[in-house]
């Protein structure tokens, strides 16, 4: 149990730091669509697609690695709450087009990149 807690704790901290760095570096570029949050969710979608397939095909890996990567790192990196606030901020300001655009970018982009990540992992991990 101790190693599981440490794995989640460290992974979440690293994921949150990456999300913060992405926000610092990207959000000011296009304030209407905070690119740091979008990048966090799209990168996280891609990486979790890879991780899910990798862990499913590598049953011998210690469970702490899955907790570190999926529960911790991806949980710290991706952010539904920030995404929700950014969409609703546009909506309450009457900017419904921007609200819809931000929502669509996150949802379509994340689903697409999660699928691409799964495809990538299957291609990498396929028996030769």
UniProtKB/Swiss-Prot annotation:
Fluoride-specific ion channel. Important for reducing fluoride concentration in the cell, thus reducing its toxicity. One of its GO terms (cellular component) is plasma membrane. It comes from Burkholderia pseudomallei (strain 668). The gene is fluC. It holds the Pfam family CRCB. It catalyses: fluoride(in) = fluoride(out). This is Fluoride-specific ion channel FluC. Its main location: membrane. The chain crosses the membrane at residues 5-25, 35-55, 67-87, 96-116.
């Amino acid at each position: 149990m101790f190693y599981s807690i440490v794995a989640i704790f460290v992974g979440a901290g690293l994921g949150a730091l990456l999300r913060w760095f992405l926000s610092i570096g990207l959000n000011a570029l296009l304030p209407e669509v905070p690119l740091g949050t979008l990048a966090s969710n799209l990168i996280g979608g891609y990486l979790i697609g890879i991780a899910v397939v990798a862990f499913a095909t590598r049953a011998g890996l210690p469970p702490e690695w899955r907790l570190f990567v999926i529960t911790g790192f991806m949980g710290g990196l991706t952010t539904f709450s920030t995404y929700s606030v950014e969409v609703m901020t546009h909506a309450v300001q009457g900017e419904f087009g921007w609200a819809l655009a931000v929502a669509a970018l996150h949802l379509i982009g994340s689903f697409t990149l999660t699928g691409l990540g799964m495809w990538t992992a299957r291609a990498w991990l396929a028996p030769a």
